Design a protein with these regions (language model features):
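Membrane-interface extramembranous regions
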Residues: 1-287
Length: 287
């Protein structure tokens, strides 16, 4: 697969996810998400939450448009890179808010609504690959895209060993044609433990493969990680709450659609580590 095809694929994944989120927020989705995010900056005291949702939705839509326009060489790379970085940083800083953590379980590192926020770590590495790889050596770029994948798999995977998370995923697992069988063989907690252990194992194997430059291990672990995020996309069609008649994506849909970003991260890593020869842009960067 050529890097031009990879660029188009990753840009498409990024643009589609941003567009779906933007439409949802423009139509009033996730008022609690908007309130929790903007209250960190004190903006909800001055501007109605509904208006802030429209502003955030508009920013996401502009970002999606810039991603597409840059692929058509209509706008410079700095435009989508800058806006994606701003959106990512704006949301990630709210992890310092107490309401991102479950206070009943001691707060940090027991993550609550922050599970959806840590996914924004994936955006900047994707943008760096699309718009800055001429200026970045291959290995740092691979690690930059690995870290968000490892973070979400390790953190959310680790949460699977807690009772509250095991119960929280029951509506997802029991309606999935690919995973519901687990409850026939294991208890709710045992099934959650297995899922969590799988997440941790795949994240660890991928990191080891990258560290030691073992292409076979990278390939196997990448497929293992990819399976996690492809599986979560299936929840859009099997679990309730993924879509809304009023705002396109419901709460679950907004959470799940962001996993497309990790699929893009994995595509970046695979393209940089599994190609038989580096692309010209990377060769020039190393030189």
């Amino acid at each position: 697969m050529s890097f031009r095809t990879i660029d188009y694929s990753i840009s498409g994944v990024l643009a589609v996810s941003l567009l779906l989120l933007s439409i949802s927020f423009l139509f009033g989705a996730g008022p609690n998400t908007i309130s929790d995010t903007f209250s960190f900056y004190g903006l909800t005291e001055w501007v109605p939450v509904a208006t802030l949702g429209i502003v955030f939705g508009f920013a996401l839509m502009v970002a999606a448009g810039l991603v597409i326009l840059q692929q058509c060489k209509i706008v410079p790379a700095a435009w989508p890179l800058t806006l994606v970085a701003i959106i990512s940083l704006f949301t990630l800083l709210t992890l310092f808010a107490e309401n991102r953590w479950i206070s009943a379980h001691g707060g940090f590192p027991v993550i609550g609504s922050g599970q959806g926020i840590i996914k924004y770590f994936a955006l900047v590495p994707i943008a760096l690959f699309l718009y800055c790889r001429h200026h970045i050596n291959t290995r740092p770029l691979v690690w930059a895209n690995y870290l968000p994948v490892a973070l979400v798999l390790a953190w959310i995977g680790g949460m699977k060993f807690l009772e509250l998370e095991a119960k929280a995923i029951v509506p997802l697992v029991e309606t999935s044609p690919f995973m519901s069988w687990m409850y026939d063989l294991f208890s709710v907690q045992e099934a959650s433990n297995i899922i969590g252990a799988y997440d941790l194992l795949m994240a660890g194997l991928l990191g080891i493969g990258i560290w030691f430059n073992q292409r076979i291990l990278i390939g196997v672990a990448s497929l293992g990680c990819l399976a996690v995020f492809v599986m979560t996309q299936s929840f859009l069609f099997t679990a309730s709450g993924a879509f809304s008649d009023m705002s396109l994506l419901g709460g679950l849909g907004q959470f799940v659609i962001k996993d497309l970003w990790f699929i893009a991260n994995i595509m970046v890593m695979a393209s940089l580590t599994l190609e038989s020869s580096p692309p010209e842009s990377l060769e020039s960067a190393v030189a």
